Amino acid sequence: MTQSLSGTAAGCDTCGFKLGEPIAKLEVSDLCFVSDHRFPGRCVVTLHQHATELFELSPSVRRAFADDVSRAARAVKLAVNSFKMNYEILGNAEPHVHCHLIPRQLDEPKPKVPAWLHPEAQAALAAGKAEEIKQRIVTLLGQASAA
């Protein structure tokens, strides 16, 4: 199931965690878009329920979260034609289960450097480009759930 959430304010009712603009409601999480010119298509998959660790989740929710991450990653990768998707599950700064999806491109200044060590400062994408990418991601998610 995928439901578009563009423009909707979402966040954890317990801790208030929210990162990015929610663009789709997945089975147990929201897909949020982060406008980042260094990594066009960057998103965060944020678990609906509050938890700080994957092992705190029931097996069914943990599997569903992994499926949400996988579905979202596929849509993002296809939307921006990246050669590799980086998955980051951290949590020391924001103690709420979430996974960063960072599409990597071969023509980046330093494609083999971890995203957090990128030499350029983050800046937003041009509004039109961001909207185009978000729409492609949501469309691809819809196609995946119809298959």
Give the positions of each predicted feature.
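HIT superfamily nucleotide-processing domains
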Residues: 1-147
